[in-house]
Structures are given as C-alpha cells and as structure tokens.
Amino acid sequence: MPRHHQKKSSASGGGSQRQLRVGEQVRHAMAEILAQGNVHDADLEGHIVTVPEVRMSPDLKLATIYVMPLGGRDTEIVIAALERNKKFLRGEVARRVNLKFAPDVRFRVDERFDEAERIEKLLRTPAVQKDLEQDPDSDREEEQ
C-alpha cells in the first residue's frame, strides 16, 4: 500500500520553499510596477504604495498581495484602485515572473504595522512601565 505524505507548512505558516520564493519574486515585480507608476489610476496618484508581503497558494495560482500606502491613509481607496486595475497588474506580473500560469491576484491591507503600533502603545502604559522598571533581583529574593 503506497504511503501518502502530507506536506507540512513551515513553522512560520509561510508555506513551502517554492511558495516563499515565488511570493518574493511576485512581491519584487509588484513593487517595481507600482514604483514606476505604470498604473494609471487617479486614486493611486499621489500615493506611494509599499508591498511588504505576498503569499502564494500551494498551487501558485493565487497571489495574496499585502499592501500599505505610505502614511497608512486611504487604504480602502488604494485597495479599490488596485482591484480595478487587477487585470493589468496580473499581466505585468506574468511578464516579469516566469511561471507556467499567471497567478490571480488579490489585494489586502497589511495590518502588521497597526498591530505593532498597538503593542508599542501597550508597552508605554504606566502599568507595564512599572513592571519593566521593577528590579528583577528583588523578585528572586521574594520567591526564596
């Protein structure tokens, strides 16, 4: 009876090496396209859009592209503009990244920056500051 091996994702949940490599190629291509201003959309003019991450599906046919407008403003407008230009962007990515199939693209706001800011604010609260400033040696003496 043949064994069926199930591929496990890496510990970070990023997928296989191939998914990570292709995702990085797509990220570079998309960042280059957006930086060159090749997308002619009034809603994108005046916005600098960063592409911090691209996640590929296991079959490499879907690319989830995480974007963040510089300054974090107008995220909904930028996502809508990118979605309107999805066909053009998919074609440009296909020209720049050598794959058997051009991946379908979908755009999401990268919320990691907001989460990092939230954690930073928590660390600055008085209660946490008090805990951080507490002498670690005094805790050890109390435990003994």
UniProtKB/Swiss-Prot annotation:
Its main location: cytoplasm. It is found in: Cytoplasm. Residues 134-144 have a biased composition (Acidic residues). GO terms for cellular component: cytosol. PROSITE patterns: RBFA. InterPro entries: KH_dom-like_a/b, RbfA, RbfA_dom_sf, Ribosome-bd_factorA_CS. Residues 1-22, 125-144 are annotated as: Disordered. GO terms for biological process: maturation of SSU-rRNA; ribosome biogenesis. Keywords: Cytoplasm, Ribosome biogenesis. One of its GO terms (molecular function) is ribosomal small subunit binding. Pfam families: RBFA. Belongs to the RbfA family. One of several proteins that assist in the late maturation steps of the functional core of the 30S ribosomal subunit. Associates with free 30S ribosomal subunits (but not with 30S subunits that are part of 70S ribosomes or polysomes). Required for efficient processing of 16S rRNA. May interact with the 5'-terminal helix region of 16S rRNA. Monomer. Binds 30S ribosomal subunits, but not 50S ribosomal subunits or 70S ribosomes. This is Ribosome-binding factor A. It comes from Bradyrhizobium diazoefficiens (strain JCM 10833 / BCRC 13528 / IAM 13628 / NBRC 14792 / USDA 110). The gene is rbfA.
